[in-house]
Amino acid sequence: MGKEKFHKSQHWGFCNNVRMLVGEDKPGIGGELLFGQKIKPKYSVFPKGMGTDSPSWVAFDKQVLSFDAYLEDEVPDKSQENYRIRRYKIYFYLEDDTVEVNEPVLQNSGLPQGIFIRRHRISLPPPNEDQFYTVHHFNVNTDIVFYGRTFKVYDCDAFTKNFLTKIGVKLNPPGQCPEDPYMKTRREKLDCMEPICPYESFDTLKQFLEYDRKVLRFFCVWDDSGSVFGDRRELILHYFLSDDTIEIKEVLPHNSGRDAMSLFLQRRKLPKYGPPGVYQPGQLTDQTVLNVYGGYSETRVYGFLLDKYQLGKLDQEFYKDTDLSIGTTINVWGRKVLLCDCDDFTKTYYRTKYGIENFTSIPCKAPSPPKIERKFPPYTGFGSEEDSLRSCIGLMPTPHQRNFKKFIEFDSYGNISNTLRFFAKLITHKCADVERMFVISYFLSDDTISVFEPIERNSGYTGGMFLKRVRVKKPGQEVFKSEFSEYIKAEELYVGAKVNVNGYLFFLVNADEYTLNYMERNSDKFPLSSIELVIQKLKEEECKSRELKQVFTAADCMHTKMVDFNTFREIMMNLTVGKLTDQEVITIARRYRVPEDPCPHRNVLVAQAHEQLKKNAFENFERLIAMCVYEDREKKKVLPSKDIKRLCKSSRLPLNEDLLGSLLSGFEDSEKQINYESFFCALNWRVNPVPVLEVASYIKERCEDEWLGMPSPIPVKYIYYLNLLKDVFGVDE
């Protein structure tokens, strides 16, 4: 009842075309065993490896049982011994039930040792030779037969004990391996023997392999100032841990007058008590060779004897790593060398090996002598001051080397000019020169200044270059002197400053946009352009906060919460009583300014474009649209703005660069794409005329032309004064 398996096993088959019984180990119907049948296990049952369980070769990977065993090996035809006890290690690999027997190496045994039985599955002794050893056949204090040899297992390791206990094997108490009687007798004889030739080994291979390329480094000094023409010599001592040798190098200062030697002391063992004198060959050796030998051949002498009593041997002590420490004075062939400091590796070595924690260094350098200031003759007046100085340094005059790094860093490239431009007026008592306007340019690459006067018609002045590009000295300095003159620096230029340029006094009234932005970005060099410092200065006038709000409110008649720049500057200057400069007022105004439209309205641009197209009688818009359709491969009716600009230039569209760029930016979408049909339809002045608008022509002029005959332009138009009052005084509306 309840059976679901009824198949019958195949018991008969063919082997080499011969009918024979092949199902001795197969069960009967439904997997049940036949009467009297016992299935012989092929492998250990731990683990079973059925279903989702891990197989044995995965679960027991790299897990080995280790047993200690011995074997009584009979020794025939020998009177000294009848048998010999041979020890073995039996390894049972759990992953595949293989066994390996290994015999440990015994010195001077005369037996072939090592692997006694290679790793494989070993069958049980007869009559069960058709089965193999499994983990359940091993235990302590039992006999195991491998190929007719009986191994007596007397112990195992801790892992084997724990494993056998976990799988349910009851371990027997461990036994002891009997001592080999012959080895015992031989050991007793060796202990009482005194060899004629001493067996002393001087093995330095371990030290070499452990400390190769590891060197202790000490910084030391040899004070030889007591001798004639002697002085303090700085040295570096290298102690090689691989062979206990010492090497010393000398650190020669610049222009010391001494010959540059590669080594102060060649690498060798350094004796403690030196110089010890001159010894004969063979006196300082590890072993003494007696003057007897058994013969010689063409290659070597053989049959020599060593003196085991070491009579007459000279012992010489050498410096070791334990003798070296900071503050110790060592003897280097009669020279007293003081160890002053060491490197980090040396400190770690002594801290790890000897537990030393005190590594206080000793100053090894002598106090530097007072520096003699070199005096140069005064400036002669010929050439520049740098050229005169270079002619005094050496016999062969060399040109002055400019600061090339600064030149590369601040040279103009692209749209970045690295030039600070200020607009100034001449401070003079002459009425004709009061209204003259100048442009002062400061070049950051070489700290030079140029002054330009814009050309104004009917002014009586030719204009043009007022001062060519040159470095400008500060006034009040002596001309013929040995020191370099001081020149005007960029930090001294700001709006509201007075600059003396070769006797002409200029008042800086304004600066261009690039200069103001540069000064605000580098507020550490230009503190007057730092909004934080200016706000902090305004907070000191907190007592005038109410008055300041009343003045701004009175100036804002339309209640727009903003005032123009001239009104703002006048209010700030009057209330702070001259504590703020024009540069600081501009910094505040630029921070709280009302944003302006970056470009004119699109209709204004289209009207100006129509005016230029009419003057040039350009009407070829259909051809432009056809070219755009040809370029539009995907038929989306949009093209990138750069492609439309290229087509306009190839068709000679009579619009200047600035106006065309502004038109394209006004028609492009967020992806920089332009609908070319709507763009050229808007430019078609025949089909879509636009009324003429009275606006200023959208042409970017040079700053010199824009300033010609005009007062100083304002940096911003309107300022939000309420935002300023909130940030400075916390005043609400």
Swiss-Prot record:
<dbReference type="InterPro" id="IPR011992">
    <property type="entry name" value="EF-hand-dom_pair"/>
</dbReference>
<keyword id="KW-0969">Cilium</keyword>
<dbReference type="GO" id="GO:0036126">
    <property type="term" value="C:sperm flagellum"/>
</dbReference>
<keyword id="KW-0206">Cytoskeleton</keyword>
<dbReference type="InterPro" id="IPR006602">
    <property type="entry name" value="DM10_dom"/>
</dbReference>
<keyword id="KW-0282">Flagellum</keyword>
<dbReference type="GO" id="GO:0010975">
    <property type="term" value="P:regulation of neuron projection development"/>
</dbReference>
<dbReference type="GO" id="GO:0030317">
    <property type="term" value="P:flagellated sperm motility"/>
</dbReference>
<keyword id="KW-0175">Coiled coil</keyword>
<feature type="domain" description="DM10 1">
    <location>
        <begin position="61"/>
        <end position="168"/>
    </location>
</feature>
<comment type="subunit">
    <text>Microtubule inner protein component of sperm flagellar doublet microtubules.</text>
</comment>
<keyword id="KW-0677">Repeat</keyword>
<keyword id="KW-0966">Cell projection</keyword>
<keyword id="KW-0963">Cytoplasm</keyword>
<dbReference type="Pfam" id="PF06565">
    <property type="entry name" value="DM10_dom"/>
</dbReference>
<dbReference type="GO" id="GO:0160111">
    <property type="term" value="C:axonemal A tubule inner sheath"/>
</dbReference>
<comment type="function">
    <text>Microtubule inner protein (MIP) part of the dynein-decorated doublet microtubules (DMTs) in cilia axoneme, which is required for motile cilia beating.</text>
</comment>
<feature type="domain" description="DM10 3">
    <location>
        <begin position="416"/>
        <end position="523"/>
    </location>
</feature>
<protein>
    <recommendedName>
        <fullName>EF-hand domain-containing family member C2</fullName>
    </recommendedName>
</protein>
<dbReference type="InterPro" id="IPR040193">
    <property type="entry name" value="EFHC1/EFHC2/EFHB"/>
</dbReference>
<feature type="domain" description="DM10 2">
    <location>
        <begin position="212"/>
        <end position="354"/>
    </location>
</feature>
<dbReference type="GO" id="GO:0005879">
    <property type="term" value="C:axonemal microtubule"/>
</dbReference>
